[in-house]
């Protein structure tokens, strides 16, 4: 395999480990400065140059895109995708994970456990937002940031409001997130490669620091995750569009709460904690997947006029419950079932004899008119807002810690 590692720091631990792991396995590998690419676009196909020279014919890339170059870095990765060169982490996946709000929105939509989170811009909406996540103390986060930078613990509502107002006056967008007391100063990092967790560690903050990042002096220890934590980590990474990711989880009372999905996870801490060859796992996975570059399936399947992809629900009171896919009549209507989603389980390419259960969701390809009456109704919003009392004189929400 001819491999390119995209990195601005060729001497960093993670880049060097990936480089050596590839060489040890007999692969040809180059480390390329992400900012030295130039993207060429023309009607005869996409192309690129690196340091003003045409790039070589690579089989795969491993992107290590830093937060400061997200826009250009994802453009480079996207260009490799358009050239049918395999990448374990797509441009969309990197962009999804880098924006904390977008990542939380995606995970919330797919019902992955997350700390209660709010996003508000208007000053009048800040206090109600703090109340909706459970009240102070709260964690305030900038939308972009790594290694614990831009993460602040506000002990009470007054301080939280002042911090948010200051950051917003500096044109910063912030998230307001519930503080999970039972996981104070510690979290779990699971390193996901493909469809499994290849290593995990618990990070513990130093002293009174509530952020457990290794770069902030935290300590690490290897940890064996139970099935729930492993499944949550893998599902979070895959939903984000990442095949190599570091998934950070808080140990909540009711199970794992995903804080962040990192598209360029550092390898030093987890390799030292576990003694495992994580870099080798990444290279082996890429080698096994190199023949299957990422495809925009929905876009390609929708090219045929009148055909497309849709999700169908097996309703509890519907005729399909207890029937097989073959008995449902879908195949007779020229509708192909691509995947069957049952809770957190995904069954690819289910056969005709597969029995259907209530609340199964079928990802199907077929004629749109045939599928129209089978598409589930839009999910009703489940309001969880706990309104604050209203001051009769000002008409504004009242908080016990704020003078009105």
Give the role of each language-model region.
Residues 36-57, 67-73:
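Glycine-rich, highly charged phosphate/nucleotide-binding loops
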Residues 1, 224-298, 302:
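ATP-dependent carboxylate activation and anion-phosphoryl transfer catalytic cores
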Residues 151-236, 240:
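Phosphate-binding site of ATP-dependent enzymes
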Residues 316-378:
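Cytosolic Rossmann-like ligand/nucleotide-binding regulatory domains
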Residues 67-89, 377-384:
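A short, gly/pro- and small-residue-rich
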